[in-house]
Amino acid sequence: MKTSKWIDISQPLNNDIATWPGDTPFSYEVLWSKEESGSVNVGKLTMSIHTGTHIDAPFHFDNDGKKVLDLDIQVYVGPTRIIDVSNLESIGKKELEKFHLEGVERLLLRTSSHGKANEFPDIIPHLRADIAPFLSEKGIRLIGVDVPSVDPLDDKELAAHHQLFKHSIHILENVVLDHVADGDYELIALPLALSDADGSPVRAVIRPI
């Protein structure tokens, strides 16, 4: 039986990648070269946790919330469904009711609203808070989006973040979905084992099932 190849749905991390305004710019540099050390190249990485494709832990928006190492890593591995919700200003229960989501535990939303990893968007389609109980009723445990946040970029209340985690739904942001079709896939998007962190970069990959 032929096994499908894994497809990368992560934003490549490089010195040109966009970051949240005012956040730490991404930087990779060779701190010691092989010539200097006599044996190896050693790199230095500086970045915000919320750069590129990443997950949010509840501690990101709740001082009493779980940190990355407290999260159930099983949620970030397993069957997922990709659906198209492009050309919408916001996404909630009403927009998702037309999709068959019974039995789905992980859901990735393609908005196709912003495909430039080196430019931070001015506006994005966001999730409305009423999406959380709807997804929970369906048994969905992880929601992924192809934009930097599930909430509006200038929003301070973060209603979608709070409601999603209130309903035990994990958040994956900045996935790249324009090169993959709608359908069912196997997903791996494991966070790093960061003890006290409010989120983590991930290498998100999928393959058809």
From Swiss-Prot:
Binding site for substrate: W20
EC numbers on record: 3.5.1.9
Key words of the record: Hydrolase, Metal-binding, Tryptophan catabolism, Zinc
Residue numbers binding Zn(2+) 2: D56, H161, E173
Reactions catalysed: N-formyl-L-kynurenine + H2O = L-kynurenine + formate + H(+)
Cofactor dependency: Zn(2+)
Active site: H60 (proton donor/acceptor)
Superkingdom field: Bacteria
BP terms from Gene Ontology: anthranilate metabolic process; L-tryptophan catabolic process to kynurenine
Entry keyword Metal-binding: yes
Entry note: cofactor: Binds 2 zinc ions per subunit.
A molecular function (GO) term: arylformamidase activity
Pfam families: Cyclase
Quaternary organization: Homodimer.
Family to which the UniProt record says this protein belongs: Belongs to the Cyclase 1 superfamily. KynB family.
Official protein name in the record: Kynurenine formamidase
Gene transcribed to yield this protein: kynB
